[in-house]
């Protein structure tokens, strides 16, 4: 059994295990996959976001298939917003999605600032149909890159 190591915020960071990351959108959810050993993220798939039931059935299937130890959700932070400003609708939706992931699947959820992930994915040459999965990959890679060694 591996021991977890605390990250800079005191949370336990596994030494190994799979991570799934999500770029939540009202119509589509990009998904990426990575692990703590290689700390490399790969675009995995795009889930249609049609109904709550279909969304979590699809996520549940991915969780059964990949057995992640942690989930990462991109948080669309507004760089212009101040600390006392009301949370934007896109932030509320992403936070709600992450909280629902935690509640439904009992897995820890981490948040990553994803404000430029879709733009970075497009600039990196991601095809239009793969943009959301590539944005999720960028979110997950940022998460890995910010972990202590």
UniProtKB/Swiss-Prot annotation:
Principal subcellular localisation of the protein: cytoplasm
InterPro entries (alphabetical): RNaseH-like_sf (IPR012337), YqgF (IPR005227), YqgF/RNaseH-like_dom (IPR006641), YqgF/RNaseH-like_dom_sf (IPR037027)
Protein EC: 3.1.-.-
Annotated keywords: Cytoplasm, Hydrolase, Nuclease, Ribosome biogenesis
Pfam families referenced in this protein's UniProt entry, alphabetically: RuvX (PF03652)
Gene Ontology MF annotations: nuclease activity
Any single GO CC term annotated in Swiss-Prot or TrEMBL for this entry: cytosol
Keyword Transcription regulation: no
Gene Ontology biological process terms in this record: rRNA 5'-end processing
EC top class, as a word: hydrolase
Localization of this protein: Cytoplasm
Family recorded in the similarity comment: Belongs to the YqgF nuclease family.
PANTHER family xrefs: POLYNUCLEOTIDYL TRANSFERASE, RIBONUCLEASE H-LIKE SUPERFAMILY PROTEIN (PTHR33317:SF4)
Function: Could be a nuclease involved in processing of the 5'-end of pre-16S rRNA.
Protein name: Putative pre-16S rRNA nuclease
